[in-house]
Curated annotation (Swiss-Prot):
TM segment ranges: 77-97, 114-134, 178-198
Subcellular location: Membrane
Name listed for the protein in its UniProt record: Transmembrane protein 267
Membrane topology value: Multi-pass membrane protein
GO cellular component: membrane
Keywords from the named record: Membrane, Transmembrane, Transmembrane helix
Lineage: Eukaryota, Metazoa, Chordata, Craniata, Vertebrata
Main location: membrane
């Protein structure tokens, strides 16, 4: 576990100018990107709409993880790209549920696919964490559950502005206000960063991989 000094340092770092500017940039990107996706030229083309929407999920996932770890060396880009992949790959469940590679079928489902159930996120994250602990991978890959949590949660929050959050088996919420989506997305990297410090994950990342955290 992190010491009190490390916890205090985490709090100060998370309020740094660089970190706050990055979060403001992320919030601005969310606002502009989702407004641009409403343009008729995008909305009238199913493939363009789907690819654009998925690309925004990908960028938000990458940006969020970049805020968490900072970009200090070339290997950091690998993690950032992985975060973007995790944020966008969720939508593959549309095709799995439809049982077809047809985009029309994937967009005309009778219900929401299983990876869009928000209670799946803590289930998968905790399962991954326990699996890594069992196979003694918790040091080398300690960042992975957090990356998965941030990437998938950002995807669900963004989808929530249209459909609400599906909290199976408890039902779903009303659609999230756009302003709440922007605030949660911008704040999520900082919230995770705090908890990672409190649990010692950040110190483990630094000692094992030489990652210099600047959030």
């Amino acid at each position: 576990m992190a010491s009190e000094t490390e916890k205090t340092h985490a709090l100060l770092q998370s309020c740094s100018t660089e970190s706050l500017l990055s979060s403001l940039g992320l919030g601005l990107f969310c606002t502009v990107a989702d407004r641009l996706l409403q343009f008729p030229i995008i909305q009238q083309n199913a493939w363009l709409r789907a690819l654009s929407d998925n690309s925004v999920h990908c960028v938000i996932g990458m940006w969020s993880w970049a805020i968490v770890i900072g970009i200090r060396k070339k290997t950091d880009f690998g993690e950032i790209i992985l975060a973007g992949f995790l944020a966008s790959v969720i939508d593959i469940d549309h095709f799995l549920l439809s049982g077809s590679l047809s985009l029309k079928a994937a967009l005309s489902l009778p219900r929401r696919p299983f990876l869009h159930c928000s209670t799946v996120i803590p289930t998968v994250v905790l399962t991954l964490k326990f699996t890594m602990h069992f196979f003694k991978l918790k040091d080398s890959w300690c960042f992975l559950p957090w990356m998965l949590f941030i990437s998938w949660t950002s995807h669900h929050i963004r989808d929530g502005i249209r459909h609400g959050l599906w909290m199976c088996p408890f039902g779903k919420t009303s659609p999230l206000p756009f302003w709440l989506y922007v605030i949660i997305t911008s704040s999520l990297p900082h919230i995770c960063s705090f908890v990672m410090y409190f649990t010692g994950t950040r110190q483990m990342m630094s000692s094992k991989h030489g990652i210099h955290i600047d959030v």
